[in-house]
Design a protein with these regions (language model features):
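Short, hydrophobic alpha-helical segments
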Residues: 47, 151-155
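Short amphipathic C-terminal alpha-helix that caps PH/PH-like domains
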Residues: 143-151
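Active-site C-terminal subdomain of aminotransferase-like
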Residues: 1-67, 71, 135
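Conserved C-terminal alpha-helix-loop-beta "cap" of PLP-dependent enzymes
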Residues: 70, 74-142
Length: 155
């Protein structure tokens, strides 16, 4: 088949590898091999731990964080029934929450606000909490505790 992907075109990778094996040099600006290996290792780790177990943990963490924020009066951008388990995007009026600087001051990195790109007003502000990472899902309670300790100081 012919690939329509630049980054995962296996025929291109094969030609690159064959060039090296034949003593030549080739350049293809794609993900480094060590990143591919790290991704493979993560996939294997995920499979070993259990896809269903991690899926349930991801939903548990996302639901807990969303419920916690709602209890603090923080409204989610996602309507009920349209939430994602690994990302929580919420409204704020505080520019230092929106840009993540209040979190950074407490040693936590978040993503800055997410524009909706649907004619929102100029003062529109959100912040995004990424709940990704196997380390976070292996112990939902500990992850939730670390997050809420910072949220209690920031909000």
């Amino acid at each position: 088949t012919n690939s329509d992907s630049f980054a995962i075109d296996l025929k291109k990778w094969l030609s690159i590898m064959q060039t090296y094996e034949n003593g030549g040099h080739a350049y293809h600006a794609t993900m480094p091999t060590d990143a591919l290996r790290a991704f493979r290792d993560t996939v294997l780790e995920t499979r070993e731990y259990g896809y269903e177990k991690l899926k349930l943990a991801q939903w548990e963490l996302g639901d807990k964080v969303r419920k916690y924020l709602a209890g603090k009066g923080i409204k989610s951008v996602a309507a009920e029934g349209f939430t994602a388990p690994g990302v929580v995007v919420s409204y704020t009026q505080d520019s230092e929450i929106q840009n993540g600087s209040k979190f950074a001051a407490k040693g936590m990195q978040i993503a800055a606000g997410v524009p909706l790109a649907c004619d929102e007003p100029e003062d529109f502000k959100t912040f995004r909490l990424g709940l990704f990472g196997l380390d976070k899902l292996y112990n939902v309670e500990a992850t939730f505790k670390r997050l809420t300790m910072v949220l209690d100081q920031v909000l």
